[in-house]
């Protein structure tokens, strides 16, 4: 025996067989050890060979196991192993038959045939399993298709298509492919290219998620249904799995050998096989190592001669980046562009897929959910493509409903938790002997009995509902299988079976399903996916509130001005304009191609421009920090525009993205504040033009960022001198022309023309100060509340602070400084000195024109 003459797989089999013999304590290395290892091969090559020769591999395996169990065990033999004469004859026979067939290497199937001929006891097992050496040899020759074993990994090339490709036509025949709706034009164009004499290789090019792979699956379904021209009838469509082709190819040349074997089988099929290569750009450079040839170069000759029918699929970017660079490869393929379907087409696609998802999740999907998935995904999910994003929405919403059905209902869960608490309390009270505890125990018993009754009733109801949903799910699955059987029976011409399914079994199942679905409307858990479930998933993905508004939220929105007035004083016109924009958006009546609203706030310093923006963020998101604030004084240079949208290619920071675009990509629904807008460089306004007009902005990496769900607010002090010079109570509209002249002198007309509303903020009057003092004091009280302390200011103290803090030029900001200096600082000193204790009320009044602090009154 010359081990160098054996292929890698055969060497491995012999070594594993020796290890098996030692592990079982056998002193003799017998043919049955080799047979056992061959039957346990990972890819089952020997088993497949026995099966195709008409044998029973499981019976053979059982016989080998019995034979090995009878072999005497020797413990402590020190790992000595002797070759049985039968084994030597097996190796000699394998080498002889390999030489006779012109093979350079002995392969695993030669060993299998040799065991069947010369294996002694093991050879008898083959006869019992219904297979002879002759039938095995015939099956091996059929599997090899006339090829000789001229390399150490020759087995890798056997039945290469079975190993490295998936039969799409077989999957279509078994009903495993999703139905393909529409896309007739693209499928027709693909068929036209495939029917050419040479260069008959279409490549489907389109954005990710538009349905390129689905078009090929649609072609497979059409081939199975015979809905193709004569030239494509009875063809097989196989999908090449590049992953398994490359996986495990350790040595140089192994990958090329596998690919050559695949191409050889396709060529030998003489045009009856069409190869589909998904993610075609992976071919370019695949397998390329030191001096090795990459996959695309191996394909080119076969493609050019028309021997290889191939359909590729790749995205526009990958095609440009990888395939177009290789002009020789690109010219052998004919591009077929796949565009994104419209919302109407997406609705049709979803209606066709609905049944498959209903069967998988065991829930019902309403038509309103399908329409909502198409429209909401198109509007709110900007960085992905239809129909993929709409299908994902339906899938996730269905999974959510299924999870709710399988989980315990919230109401029942609360009752069960309360029961556990009460039972623990009962155990504790049962040991007490006083009258109060006994009374409490009696009350507990009554409450426990009541809750237990409700829990039992609800549990029984929930389980019954679950069973009903389970029954409906089983009926749907059976219906799906029957429809696939019906299609197969019609194709095979078995019209008796087709009639039985169509007019007997399917109607009976449909009746059963209708009964199961005619459920009670007061179900504990929802069984139907509707538009609201879809909206909830969209909200989770994007943060945009698109669910149906609850009654409380409606009330809140209608009284929005009153809420905001709690923080911003004396600017009613501004509050109204902003509130109207938010209400428009939540009622779904805003222009879908523009931001929720864009405002320019003009007014003197300290009148509440930035404060209104913060209070708006708190009102909408219950979080003052839910705001992207751009201080435009940082964007005074021309080059600072790149900080907003990201650096261009070739510059440092290209991968990081822009400050503005990244913030909106992560959180599409928020308030964007451009503070002190007039301080920015004029080029910054050019960037904002498309944001204000189309609600979108393209960042440095070419990605489109969606601003349609943002509220854009810009603040400025331009023309503030006119507003500041007004008398108390004077209408701001009187000075609007002068203010607008100043604004027009600074901003371009095309920028101003795109802003929804330019709002003038009034100068704060003295009578506004009382409300502002109260708002500012609330913040101080909040800080004191942590120490269980409270403030009590009398009317005189409030007036004193308002007078002292009022400055018509600087607005409310001086008041903040006055409160800090005259109120907070003295309290801080008294706290540190121990004059005020925690848990007291600090009484503040006015004495001799200054604030005075009374002794803390203990609560």
UniProtKB/Swiss-Prot annotation:
Organism placement in taxonomy = Bacteria, Pseudomonadati, Pseudomonadota, Alphaproteobacteria, Caulobacterales
Which stretches make up the Clp R domain?
A: 3-146
**Which Gene3D superfamilies does the protein's record reference?**
1.10.8.60, Clp, N-terminal domain (1.10.1780.10), P-loop containing nucleotide triphosphate hydrolases (3.40.50.300)
Q: Which domain of life is it from?
A: Bacteria
Region (Repeat 1) spans which residues?
A: 6-71
Region described as C-terminal: spans on this chain: 764-859
Q: Where is this region: Repeat 2?
A: 83-146
Q: Which positions are tagged coiled coil?
A: 391-522
- Provide the residue positions that the database annotates as binding ATP 2: 603-610
Cellular compartments annotated: Cytoplasm
Show the GO MF annotations: ATP binding; ATP hydrolysis activity
Q: Which InterPro entries match?
A: AAA+_ATPase, ATPase_AAA_core, Chaperonin_ClpB, Clp_ATPase_C, Clp_N_dom_sf, Clp_R_dom, ClpA/B, ClpA/B_CS1
Family designation: Belongs to the ClpA/ClpB family.
Q: Where does ATP 1 bind?
A: 206-213
Q: What does this protein do?
A: Part of a stress-induced multi-chaperone system, it is involved in the recovery of the cell from heat-induced damage, in cooperation with DnaK, DnaJ and GrpE. Acts before DnaK, in the processing of protein aggregates. Protein binding stimulates the ATPase activity; ATP hydrolysis unfolds the denatured protein aggregates, which probably helps expose new hydrophobic binding sites on the surface of ClpB-bound aggregates, contributing to the solubilization and refolding of denatured protein aggregates by DnaK.
Tell me the keywords, alphabetical order. Answer: ATP-binding, Chaperone, Coiled coil, Cytoplasm, Nucleotide-binding, Repeat, Stress response
Q: Which NCBIfam families match?
A: chaperone_ClpB
For this protein, the parts annotated as crossing the membrane are none
- PROSITE patterns in the record, alphabetically? CLP_R, CLPAB_1, CLPAB_2
What's this protein's name? Answer: Chaperone protein ClpB
Q: Which GO terms describe its biological process?
A: cellular response to heat; protein refolding
Record comment regarding domains: The Clp repeat (R) domain probably functions as a substrate-discriminating domain, recruiting aggregated proteins to the ClpB hexamer and/or stabilizing bound proteins. The NBD2 domain is responsible for oligomerization, whereas the NBD1 domain stabilizes the hexamer probably in an ATP-dependent manner. The movement of the coiled-coil domain is essential for ClpB ability to rescue proteins from an aggregated state, probably by pulling apart large aggregated proteins, which are bound between the coiled-coils motifs of adjacent ClpB subunits in the functional hexamer.
Map out region (NBD2) in residue numbers.
553-763
User: SMART domains given for it?
Assistant: AAA, ClpB_D2-small
Q: Which PANTHER family would you find in this protein's record? A: ATP-DEPENDENT CLP PROTEASE (PTHR11638), HEAT SHOCK PROTEIN 104 (PTHR11638:SF18)
Name the segments for region: NBD1: 159-340
State the GO CC annotations.
Answer: cytoplasm
């Amino acid at each position: 025996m010359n081990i160098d003459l054996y292929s890698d797989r055969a060497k491995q089999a012999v070594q594993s067989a020796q290890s098996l013999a030692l592990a079982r304590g056998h002193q003799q290395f017998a043919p049955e050890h080799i047979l056992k290892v061959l039957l346990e091969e990972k890819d089952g090559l020997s088993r497949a060979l026995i099966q195709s020769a008409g044998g029973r591999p499981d019976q053979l395996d059982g016989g080998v196991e019995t034979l090995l169990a009878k072999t005497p065990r020797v413990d402590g033999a020190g790992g000595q192993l002797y070759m049985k004469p039968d084994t030597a004859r097996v190796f000699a026979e394998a080498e002889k038959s390999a030489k006779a067939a012109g093979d350079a290497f002995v392969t695993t199937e030669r060993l299998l045939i040799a065991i069947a001929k010369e294996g002694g006891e093991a050879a008898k097992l083959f006869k019992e399993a219904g297979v002879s050496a002759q039938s095995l040899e015939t099956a091996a020759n059929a599997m090899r298709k006339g090829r000789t074993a001229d390399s150490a990994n020759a087995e890798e090339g056997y039945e290469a298509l079975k190993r490295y490709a998936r039969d799409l036509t077989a999957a279509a025949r078994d009903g495993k492919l999703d139905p393909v709706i529409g896309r007739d034009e693209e499928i027709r164009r693909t068929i036209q290219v495939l029917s050419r004499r040479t260069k008959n290789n279409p490549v489907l090019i389109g954005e990710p998620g538009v349905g390129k792979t689905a078009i090929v699956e649609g072609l497979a379904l059409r081939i199975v249904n015979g809905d193709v021209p004569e030239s494509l009838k009875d063809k097989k469509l196989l999908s090449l799995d590049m992953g398994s082709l490359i996986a495990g190819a350790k040595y140089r040349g192994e990958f090329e050998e596998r690919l050559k074997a695949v191409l050889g089988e396709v060529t030998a099929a003489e045009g009856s096989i069409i190869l589909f290569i998904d993610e075609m750009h992976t071919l370019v450079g695949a397998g390329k190592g030191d001096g090795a040839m990459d996959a695309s170069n191996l394909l080119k000759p076969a493609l050019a001669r028309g021997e290889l029918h191939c359909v590729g699929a790749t995205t526009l970017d990958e095609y440009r980046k990888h395939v177009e660079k290789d002009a020789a490869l690109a010219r052998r393929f004919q591009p077929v562009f796949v565009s994104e379907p419209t919302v109407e087409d997406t609705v049709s696609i979803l209606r066709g897929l609905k049944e498959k998802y209903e069967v998988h999740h065991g829930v019902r999907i309403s038509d309103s959910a399908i329409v909502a998935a198409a429209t909401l995904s198109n509007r709110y999910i900007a960085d992905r493509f239809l129909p993929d994003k709409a299908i994902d929405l339906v899938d996730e919403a269905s999974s959510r409903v299924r999870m709710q059905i399988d989980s315990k209902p919230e109401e029942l869960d609360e009752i069960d938790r309360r029961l556990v608490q009460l039972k623990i309390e009962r155990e504790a009270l049962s040991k007490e002997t006083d009258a109060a505890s006994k009374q409490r125990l009696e009350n507990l018993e009554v409450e426990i009995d009541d809750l237990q009754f409700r829990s039992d009733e609800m549990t029984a109801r929930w389980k019954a509902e679950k069973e009903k949903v389970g029954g409906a799910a089983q009926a749907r699955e059976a219906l799906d299988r029957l429809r696939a059987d019906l299609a197969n029976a019609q194709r095979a011409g078995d019209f008796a079976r087709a009639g039985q399914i169509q007019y007997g079994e399917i109607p009976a199942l449909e009746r059963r399903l209708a009964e199961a679905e005619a459920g009670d409307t007061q179900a504990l858990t929802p069984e139907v996916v509707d538009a609201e479930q879809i909206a909830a998933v969209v909200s989770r993905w994007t943060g945009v509130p698109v669910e149906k508004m609850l009654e409380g939220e409606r009330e809140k929105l209608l009284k929005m001005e009153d809420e905001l007035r709690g923080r911003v004083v004396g600017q009613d016109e501004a509050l109204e304009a902003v509130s109207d924009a938010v209400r428009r958006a939540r009622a779904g009546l805003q222009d879908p191609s523009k931001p929720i609203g864009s405002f320019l706030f003009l007014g003197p310093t300290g009148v509440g421009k930035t404060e209104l923006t913060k209070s708006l963020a708190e009102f909408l998101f219950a979080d003052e920090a839910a705001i992207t604030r751009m201080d435009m004084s940082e964007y005074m240079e021309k080059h600072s525009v790149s900080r907003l949208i990201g650096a261009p290619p070739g510059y440092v920071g290209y991968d990081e993205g822009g400050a503005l675009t990244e913030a909106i990509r992560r959180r599409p629904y928020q308030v964007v504040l451009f503070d002190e807008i007039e301080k920015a460089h004029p080029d910054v306004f050019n960037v904002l033009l498309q944001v204000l007009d189309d609600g979108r902005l393209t960042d440095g990496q070419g990605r489109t960022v969606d601003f349609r769900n943002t509220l854009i607010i810009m603040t400025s002090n331009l023309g503030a001198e006119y507003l500041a010079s007004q008398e108390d109570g004077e209408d701001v509209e009187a000075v609007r022309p002068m203010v607008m002249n100043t604004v027009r002198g600074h901003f371009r007309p095309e920028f101003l023309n795109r802003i929804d509303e330019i709002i003038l903020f009034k100068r704060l009057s003295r009578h506004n100060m009382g409300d502002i003092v109260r708002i500012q004091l609330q913040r101080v009280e909040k800080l004191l509340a942590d120490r269980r302390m409270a403030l009590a200011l009398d009317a005189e103290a409030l007036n004193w602070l308002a007078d002292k803090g009022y400055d018509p030029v600087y607005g409310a900001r001086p008041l903040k400084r006055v409160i800090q200096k005259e109120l907070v600082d003295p309290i801080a000193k008294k706290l540190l000195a121990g004059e005020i204790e925690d848990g007291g009320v600090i009484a503040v009044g006015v004495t001799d024109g200054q604030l005075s602090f009374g002794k803390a009154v203990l609560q």
